[in-house]
């Protein structure tokens, strides 16, 4: 049985509102959700807040529909980047990113999109679905992101709110599919209210309109999401990796190494 995941629930203004969205996700059959904390540096006082804890939301998380296990609640950071300096917080040495299970970036220009695909240490690149894309997707950066294990995210909430936004969502999704061929795609809700959520199989059907095959549409809600989470774990683990260095030889060791094998045998 597939394990469905929604990696983008908007961090609501009130705890009660967020609780109701998570409860609806569990009722619809999602096994895990990520609360999305957005950092927008264009604001006068940009701030990356500490992610909300599961304990602050539920004493006991709601049980997933059709299963006996509670829903898993993850933490996600999305940085809206309109300038190269906004990527500084995404460095692997940044203590901020280690607080989150998933780190995403929303690049506003083609140059920033290229940098996110080829050089920036993130798990997800967000695709704008609310307006006509300001540039064309190109194969080299998209392929580079796929090779690095980075995923591209499409959100479906705008498509169910407004007919104009639906056209932009489908158009931008199809443009991306022409380049990536359905690889490394994630579909999330971006929901702020319970009624904006849709069941996993309904979302997979919507994925067909985005140009995905039936198999790829299902993967965009399940296996690809788990792969993105694994990428996030690896990113955090890599921060603490230590390098092993060959022990330097002492003069005595060097002397022994220089002796012929026959001479060593006589000594023994």
Question: What is each of the regions a protein language model found here?
Answer:
Residues 69-106, 110:
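Hydrophobic alpha-helical segments and helix pairs
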Residues 1-35, 41-68, 94-98, 111-268:
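Charged catalytic cores and adjacent phosphate/nucleic-acid-binding surfaces used
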